[in-house]
Swiss-Prot record:
Disulfide bonds: none
Protein name per UniProt: 3-isopropylmalate dehydrogenase
Catalytic activity: (2R,3S)-3-isopropylmalate + NAD(+) = 4-methyl-2-oxopentanoate + CO2 + NADH
Binding site for NAD(+): 78-89, 288-299
Amino acid sequence: MSEKTIVVLPGDHVGTEITNEAIKVLKAIEEVRPNVKFNFQHHLIGGAAIDATGVPLPDEALEAAKKADAVLLGAVGGPKWGTGAVRPEQGLLKIRKELNLYANLRPCNFASESLLELSPIKAEFAKGTDFTVVRELVGGIYFGERKEDDGSGVASDTETYSVPEVQRITRMAAFMALQHNPPLPIWSLDKANVLASSRLWRKTVTETIEKEFPQLTVQHQLIDSAAMILIKSPTTLNGIVITSNMFGDIISDEASVIPGSLGLLPSASLASLPDTNKAFGLYEPCHGSAPDLPANKVNPIATILSAAMMLKLSLDLFEEGVALEKAVKEVLDAGVRTGDLRGSNSTKEVGDAAVEAAKRILKN
């Protein structure tokens, strides 16, 4: 038996509820698979960490994460901590940088076709949407040179990218494309008509694909045009979508409304290619901490699907990850849903249903 260590960072507000449901489903796998054992280690991050320690990411949490097989994160932030000098989101940025989590993967698809009616896009246009945004996560404007307003009325942020950074994220996108037969097309989003960093981005993506992955195709699209296409004809972008940190942040949030709720979409942030299904990664839902949501009302599906990604990409438990995805589809098809999906079930009820479905699938 090989024990997998998972550092759990619940974070703020609904973070504890959603990570609890994901853990519950993972423990169900332990029950069915005697050779699988998880070691869950809980630590603080975000506003909860600020309240307890004065910093958004305590050293002990970071050190535990460095030694783990994977990290499961809930959500951070909330109006309580405002936009002061010490903010919850700083903990998230720090852990990404310290763990070198350079690639953020955000799938956009329908976990169940029964959800098509909930999409703000007409079903005939939304049906079949299936792409993954591969976002560069530790470079660009979020980590560039920054100048706060010192009273002069001027502030600035600097966007910087290097060839090695762009090559690295391009190789991740290529790897993901090659997991399919035939390989998926790659879309690269930038603002090369205006930004020097985007011109370097486009040139490097093109050269890397041509030299290292000649069997793949890449199409370049300006980010503003891509944002329009995403609403007008989302299936046009089916495949792998690669882009920079800020553009990826924006376009993936826009994409997240297509399936009908932020509560459905998982994400993975990886430190290496998952070529042996053992890449170190941090897994979290795409939604925020939802401070105004009453207890037991948050949708846990995105976090459960994040756990499924963790099983497949970091813990070398691919079959179990697929089983979780099938379980989620069964739950949604059965109409067990929280309020964001026009359902009446609680967080716990959805989690319980996922547990029972996963057990049944794994036993067959």
